[in-house]
């Protein structure tokens, strides 16, 4: 195994793996990555754990005034929270030069959670967009469809589908020990399904392209169609002076921002991954220079994708007055627990619930 193979021990929990494609190339990792990437991972971990925890608690507390959008946002935060708790493992992995000391089980589970988060996040955003589409474009006829029962069914479908699509990671991800470097990597191993040389190439390319199509391109296209119709309806029919329409505009602005930020964070990751997959199929350049560029860009594209998991709570706080108010009430409640009697706690809770307005 040469320098390139050592580096491509699948240092991130997706289907990106250039060991076959670039076995004749020499590659030297950019040394600052071993220090910079772990620091970024831990920063995302701290911000994501705190921010998404606050979002989940805020959504949970306002049960009586909870909007459909709040439920999807709560599940989006749950997906992000589940993912960020694995980041310390990946930080250690990178800091040790892509050596995995945590065993096979954590290798499989933490890799699975990363893809589960990717699918669940984009599906939650898609359902948010569809909910806004039904509420705005078909406001008079969508009442029967936008019920709690349908919402629960869609959430069940989101998590089941996400779990199934991420399942190949549980099957193929394992630890691989390299005698030459004395390192154990958390990598994809297709020996269970590969019987002839060259078949692994199609498995890697197929899984990579399908995950990008199902976990990014198709949902993003669906969301763009929704917002196209929404934009036309808002332009024609919304009255900027009506309070109900103002609330709908604010919520629409928040959700649109979430979608745009998600696309911006994940697009470089999917571009790098897709170009790598296409090079396997001889549909993209396979020169050492091009492959080295992909390998150098991949950890940072991955890191940018992970940043999305800590940005959403900041976006809620910046754009959503309702969310900010509830967070302030939450802080006041904590103070009241230490400084006020039970009556103060009750009044604070009533104030927090009164801030919620259905849209």
UniProtKB/Swiss-Prot annotation:
Disulfide bridge positions per record: 25-288, 107-186
The membrane spanning regions, by residue number, are 37-57, 76-96, 109-129, 152-172, 214-234, 252-272, 287-307
Q: Which GO terms describe its molecular function?
A: apelin receptor activity; mechanoreceptor activity
A Pfam family reported for this protein in Swiss-Prot or TrEMBL? 7tm_1
Expressed in which tissues: Mesendodermal expression at the blastoderm margin appears by 4.5 hpf. At early gastrulation, expression is maintained ventrolaterally while expression in dorsal cells and random deep cells declines. During gastrulation and segmentation, expression is maintained in adaxial, intermediate, and lateral plate mesoderm. During late segmentation, expressed in several regions including the forming heart. By 24 hpf, expressed in the dorsal aorta, caudal vein, and intersomitic blood vessels.
One GO cellular component assignment for this chain's record is: plasma membrane
Q: Where in the cell is it found?
A: Cell membrane
Instruction: List the keywords (alphabetical).
Output: Angiogenesis, Cell membrane, Developmental protein, Disulfide bond, G-protein coupled receptor, Gastrulation, Glycoprotein, Membrane, Receptor, Transducer, Transmembrane, Transmembrane helix
Q: Which InterPro entries does the entry link to?
A: ATII_rcpt, CCR1-9-like, GPCR_Rhodpsn, GPCR_Rhodpsn_7TM
Q: Topology check: give the Cytoplasmic ranges.
A: 58-75, 130-151, 235-251, 308-359
Function, as annotated, reads: G protein-coupled receptor for peptide hormones apelin (apln) and apelin receptor early endogenous ligand (apela), that plays a role in the regulation of normal cardiovascular function and fluid homeostasis. When acting as apelin receptor, activates both G(i) protein pathway that inhibits adenylate cyclase activity, and the beta-arrestin pathway that promotes internalization of the receptor. Also functions as mechanoreceptor that is activated by pathological stimuli in a G-protein-independent fashion to induce beta-arrestin signaling, hence eliciting cardiac hypertrophy.
The record ties this protein, via PANTHER family, to: APELIN RECEPTOR, CELL ADHESION MOLECULE
Q: What is this protein called?
A: Apelin receptor B
Where does this protein come from, organism-wise? Answer: Danio rerio (Zebrafish)
